Amino acid sequence: MGKHIIPQRRGHGSLVYRSPSHRHVVDVKHLKPGEYVVKDIIHAPGRNSPLLELVDSTGKKVYQIAFTGAYVGQKIVAGNVDTINPGTTTVLANIPDGSYVYNIESSPGDGGEFCRSAGTFALVVSHGSRVTLKLPSGSMRDFDPRCRATVGVVAASGIIDAPILKAGTHVHYLRSKAKRPYTVRGVAMNAVNHPHGGGNHQHVGRPSTVGRNAPPGRKVGRLSPKRRKVNGSK
């Protein structure tokens, strides 16, 4: 009897494949309208960008994704404001063209979905019935003017330039994101572990195309590929 393949194990949801959410600081959403002071800049497990630990007028702690240039003691404003500074959170209708923004809402009130990882930002291109932003991928996307965003660029833009140096460091980094630190090819496995495994040399040994409705244990290889057209055929 064969063993479950990796997608089946991941779908089962054991601790190996589950994100260690008990280590995460908080699920970062947009700030409520008001004034805040940066108390500290902290590391957040599972994220590649730091977080700002903020304090409001009542002394309550809240968190925000850090932006480039933030410092302890800095004052940050959220809501409808006249002056736009880095770290200000407001609706897109109030942010002028040419500004860099991050943590952009997809729909008003969802807390932010776009441009949240280290070094990312979007460019405000134009205003109208919809606000047009240029995303990091280069694509243009229209947003509701009531969607909120934070002015600035997400901090830690140089994270991809810093070498990891040690394999163990990379393992812990990926496990905090519930990702596997390595990948083993199916043809390199034994026949009991994968449909492509086994044999005297590494080869699939069968057609690698599988149907869209194949069961999970057999759904590996080229999934429901389109039919290849031959020259001269209709």
From Swiss-Prot:
User: What is an example of a GO molecular function annotated in this UniProt entry?
Assistant: structural constituent of ribosome
Q: Name one GO biological process term.
A: cytoplasmic translation
Biased-composition ranges, Basic residues, are 219-234
Q: Name the domain of life this protein comes from.
A: Archaea
- Segments carrying the region annotation (Disordered) are 195-234
Q: Which Gene3D superfamilies match?
A: 2.30.30.30, Nucleic acid-binding proteins, Ribosomal protein L2, domain 3
Write down a Pfam family by its short name: Ribosomal_L2_C
Listed under GO cellular component are: cytosolic large ribosomal subunit
Keywords from UniProt, A to Z, are: Ribonucleoprotein, Ribosomal protein, RNA-binding, rRNA-binding
Q: Which family does it belong to?
A: Belongs to the universal ribosomal protein uL2 family.
- Known role: One of the primary rRNA binding proteins. Required for association of the 30S and 50S subunits to form the 70S ribosome, for tRNA binding and peptide bond formation. It has been suggested to have peptidyltransferase activity; this is somewhat controversial. Makes several contacts with the 16S rRNA in the 70S ribosome.
Subunit composition and interactions: Part of the 50S ribosomal subunit. Forms a bridge to the 30S subunit in the 70S ribosome.
Protein name (record): Large ribosomal subunit protein uL2
Q: What organism is listed for this UniProt entry?
A: Thermoplasma volcanium (strain ATCC 51530 / DSM 4299 / JCM 9571 / NBRC 15438 / GSS1)
